[in-house]
Structure formats: structure tokens, C-alpha cells
Amino acid sequence: MKNILFIVVLFLFLKSSGQNVNEEFDGKKCEAPYVLDTIKGWDVERFLIPISFAPSIPYKGIEDIRFTPGWAKKTTNEYWSYAFLWYLDGTVTLDARTIENNLKAYYTGLIKVNSDSSKIADKLFPVTSSIKPRTTEKEDLKTFEGSVTMLDYMSKQAITLNLVIHIRTCAGKDKTFVFHEISPMPYPDDVWKRLHQLWVNFKCDKK
């Protein structure tokens, strides 16, 4: 995640982007075949799936993240507010239970690589997640909402992140798009409008 160096020396054959199997993946230079806005002031990070800190998540593809400017500033409503897209190979079937398990594995691994467990052992507790379907939004196959409760490795306190998750496929592409909007703020807060606008503006390709 942001402010932590992830050294990824892996190889990926991406038919859609034309990358050669012998090329190193460079998240900064990666040219996505889809459109996910890059907003001035927002940080971007990309890395390969399977995810180094959550190898039990059984997919292949790319994670593409957008961090709000206030992502690491606890005094703002953008603290821990960000979005990420999973651009996955093939048709991936997802239900609420599968998403819950994926999120538990993801955030458990994330905390581990961003924390010195010997110093915060008394604060560690299992990540919990709760996901349910919500009204399916336009162009989504499915839409979900829910929460993750975990240790905030920045403040060393418990935090609950609210989530909205969108599943989409696109004609002519053997890919599954899974877009996560995340914030500890309640849903009426205007930070959700900014996060959701990324998905509203999303396009399956650049044509």
C-alpha cells in the first residue's frame, strides 16, 4: 500500500495489454487497456495478482488503486478513503461469502506487512468482514456493500471500513472487473461521491 515499498519481480502474460511474458511488471509504467481516472492529487499504485501479502486469494490479474489526497491524514474525512480495481483474468464468480473471505485474507496480510507485530501484539485482533448484496447498479452484474473491522496500522487503533463493491464484465473481453470503494465515513459523506465517480467514469477499453 501507499508509503510502503512493494518490490515485485514477477511475470505476467497479458493478452489484452500485449505485455511479453519475459518483461518485468512495472506498476508505474503499466498502461491499462481500460479507463480508470487518474485524478490530480490522488496517488496511484498498481501491482500483480496473486497478491504478495494475500497469496490465498486465487485470482490472476492486476490491482489498480486510487488513494484520496487525505488517505493518511486522520483529521480529514478522506482518511483511509480509497478505491481499487481488480482486473482479473477469466470469468470469476463472486458472492457475499467469497468476498468476505477475500477481504479477510487481504486485510490480514496488509496489516502484517505494514506492522511490527512484536510492538503491537497487545493490539492485534482478527480481521472481520461482513458483506451483503445491495441493489444492482447500472452496468454491474452484482453490487455489494458491507464492512471490514481491523487494526488500523497507522493509528494502532481499531477501525471499521465501509465498502461498496461492483462486479462487471465487458463484451468481447475474457476479464472480470471488481471495483472496491472504501472509507470509514458513513455513506452519506461526500467522500463517497468522489470514490463512486471513478466507477461512473470507468470504461472497459480506451477506444
Predicted regions located by residue number:
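Stable alpha-helical elements in mature extracytoplasmic
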Residues: 49, 99-106, 191-198
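N-terminal "mature-domain start" segment
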Residues: 21-66
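Short, well-structured beta-strand
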Residues: 138-207
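Second-shell loop/turn segments in exported
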Residues: 35, 88-98, 181-189
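Short, solvent-exposed beta-alpha or beta-beta edge segments that form flexible loop/patches at the rim
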Residues: 59-71, 75, 160
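Conserved polar/disulfide-associated segments of primarily extracytoplasmic proteins
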Residues: 70-153
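Bacterial Sec-dependent N-terminal signal peptides
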Residues: 1-25
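Short, exposed beta-strand/loop patches in secreted or surface proteins that constitute
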Residues: 56-58, 131-135, 169
